[in-house]
Design a protein with these regions (language model features):
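Feature marking long nucleic-acid-engaging regions of large polymerase/nuclease enzymes
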Residues: 1-89, 137-192
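Gly/Pro-rich turn-and-neighbor structural signature
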Residues: 90-142
Length: 192
């Protein structure tokens, strides 16, 4: 390994493979020494890099307003079909949920493209390395939160369109915390 050229960053998956190979080839003692050195290198270069995160690093979707507008039009058409008796309540509900899932997926796809192209953005570096965060969390940060669930597990058909960067309205904040409050209450009751 010492003589091998470093041609790309080491994501967590690659590091796991390297550690597994070293563990197979050497004893536990040598592996633990290597891991200590690897940890020290990680601390050293993460400090030297000076990577910081600011709100300017949070890329946003330029086509999100258009995606949301199209989704709202589609939901209006679905609701008109229901009011005319062309579809059942369950069909209406499922269709509306699917429209909002697709809208969030479109926003996520655009943000994934931005992430794939960005080599120096610290948020994307952490995400790509596997150190912190996933694309779904980044979508909530800069795209849209999407659909939330009721405490019983049923999905609320009104989406949280705003992202954390944009800021949530009072109603969106309430929707976002709906099932979290139930989870906290259940935990408190179970531990009491």
């Amino acid at each position: 390994i010492k003589e091998m050229p470093l041609v790309e960053p080491f994501p967590v998956k690659t590091l796991k493979q390297i550690i597994a190979q070293i563990f197979k080839l050497y004893k536990t003692t040598e592996t633990s020494i290597m891991l200590d050195r690897l940890k020290d290198l990680g601390f050293k270069y993460s400090t030297v890099s000076g990577a910081t995160v600011s709100t300017h690093d949070v890329a946003t979707s330029s086509s999100k307003p258009e995606i949301i507008a199209n989704a709202k039009k589609t939901v209006d058409k679905i609701n008109k079909q229901y009011s005319r008796g062309l579809i059942t309540e369950e069909e209406r509900y499922e269709s509306v949920i699917n429209v909002w899932y697709k809208a969030k997926d479109q926003v996520q796809a655009e943000l994934q493209e931005i992430a794939d192209k960005s080599l120096t953005n610290p948020i994307f570096m952490m995400m790509k390395s596997g150190a912190r965060g996933k694309i779904s969390q980044f979508v909530q940060l800069s795209g849209m939160r999407g659909l939330m669930s009721k405490p019983g597990g049923r999905v609320i058909e009104i989406p949280v369109i705003s992202s954390f960067k944009e800021g949530l309205s009072v109603s969106e904040f309430f929707l976002s915390t709906h099932s979290a409050r139930k989870g906290s209450a259940d935990t408190a009751l179970n531990t009491a």
